[in-house]
């Protein structure tokens, strides 16, 4: 969407009162510079959903609500997988009921339902980033919980987790800070036990 021509005449396009009067239909959640809008959201959701949809159907502007439903299911799957692996790693004596309650609580207590209630570009990028964060943490936990003799599986989970965390930067860059959680997950095996060192 092109910015309204009236915005170019404003001395300060970020002055709320002046902008509402001159260009009431202008977008707010974007950067405006030299007569153009710039979106600071990541490009990954567009590359994963919008572009393939347009290439297959020729229809532009896939509504964010459709891919967000798929992302919500991927989020819930990642929550259950992450909780299962976390319980296996740190609470091996926990019952299956406790594990199930923790997973249901984590999925229900997330902002997932709010994001689905208001499917827009902003919420789309947040949900996509959250999905990749949880999938990364889940895969790293799977790698940490897999016996070292199964090197192929360990490498697969480490690689998939790292790819997911890299994709987070293309959704909501500030969510990459969750990568620090790799330390408590991977530290015991790769630092304490010195598995990164060559012999």
What are these regions (language model features)?
Residues 127-151, 157-165, 179-182:
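Specific aromatic-rich, kink-prone transmembrane helix
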Residues 106-135:
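Membrane-interface micro-motifs in multi-pass membrane enzymes
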Residues 1-41, 56, 83, 106-107, ...:
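Interfacial juxtamembrane loops and adjacent helix segments
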Residues 177-199:
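Perimembrane helix-loop-helix junctions
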Residues 79-111, 131, 147-157:
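Transmembrane-helix signature of polytopic, membrane-embedded enzymes
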Residues 25-70, 88-93, 115-119:
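Juxtamembrane segments of multi-pass membrane glycosylation machinery
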Residues 63-92, 135-139:
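Transmembrane-helix motifs of polytopic, lipid-linked glycan transferases
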